[in-house]
């Protein structure tokens, strides 16, 4: 193999097997795809050690992808439940899974996911550092942080969130500009605390070249974490967020110089009117790198319904340039999601992604809607169920409320507009009060 990473291959004019897979899935010319990978505008996260991977592309002109977060915590350490979530997420056609386990020795769980998963897998190595070394945060050395990054890369993860943008300069801006909700990124808050406790630079920023060397060796895509993402709509598009975004743009170019693929992570909580501008800012400041957003959640008043606040923001974000949506569940801000929470979060996120793809004229997106509308016109219930984003729920609703006549539903009955227009357009009579002949 005469290339190190997908980006290195693309720059050399080499079309990899992963590029061919993505080209076929997306209906995009493979040479155009290769050029965009070379430019950093598309990434194909594909760790050399992830042998079961069915490659996906993320970025310009491709379908919007969704990620599902899962993993164990100290309060909820049921590995079997998390593995069941993995299986369900794959069945529901999520394109990526992130293991955000934050308790104990996570290696076994991570390795099992890599072995069983055909989808992209991501991690946040700093979450693992405390459990990996069984040390308090402030006692972990920069070299030890880097060793955890290498371990995750060896284990086969395709992308890693690295919060390298929260350096001492960004921290100064944060201190000068008061926020309502401070730093809500878990990884970002841990690194900020480490910097304050040790009076040192963020090790992922100070030794960024070493991080890139690890990523290049295994072809891990670096997902540049947004430690200063807004945790409330009050804090959105503030000095800390923008200062960090500028730094992430600089780090993006440094990664590309070493042929490391880059995703940039984004907000967060943000009111509707700010989303489009934020997408444009990221694309400009980060040189067209794919944008991976958590939401954005468009209001802060809906605990229990944040899959909805997130889907609203995610649809607008993806319609304006975001490439990758991190799902949010109804359990957000409340608890570790259970299986049903996860399912609702996936469906909400997939709806947002598809709505954006329709808006962006992504190949095949409108055709799906056309087929559904065609099935509705035909009152072909089975076809509607098969085309539904959640066939199980659609079938259950129909089954739980059976109409008198098969060609109606219990909402309108014989006043069904579709049924009656079909008959009138065919020159037939309609009977609403009496039985049909």
Curated annotation (Swiss-Prot):
Its EC number is 4.1.99.17. [4Fe-4S] cluster binds at residues 409, 412, 416. This is Phosphomethylpyrimidine synthase. Substrate binds at residues 69, 98, 127, 163, 185-187, 226-229, 265, 292. It catalyses: 5-amino-1-(5-phospho-beta-D-ribosyl)imidazole + S-adenosyl-L-methionine = 4-amino-2-methyl-5-(phosphooxymethyl)pyrimidine + CO + 5'-deoxyadenosine + formate + L-methionine + 3 H(+). The keyword Cell inner membrane does not apply. InterPro entries: ThiC (IPR037509), ThiC/Bza_core_dom (IPR038521), ThiC/BzaA/B (IPR002817). It is an enzyme of class 4 (lyase). It comes from Clostridium kluyveri (strain ATCC 8527 / DSM 555 / NBRC 12016 / NCIMB 10680 / K1). Disulfide bonds: none annotated. Keywords: 4Fe-4S, Iron, Iron-sulfur, Lyase, Metal-binding, S-adenosyl-L-methionine, Thiamine biosynthesis, Zinc. One of its GO terms (molecular function) is carbon-carbon lyase activity. Its cofactor is [4Fe-4S] cluster. Pathway: Cofactor biosynthesis; thiamine diphosphate biosynthesis.
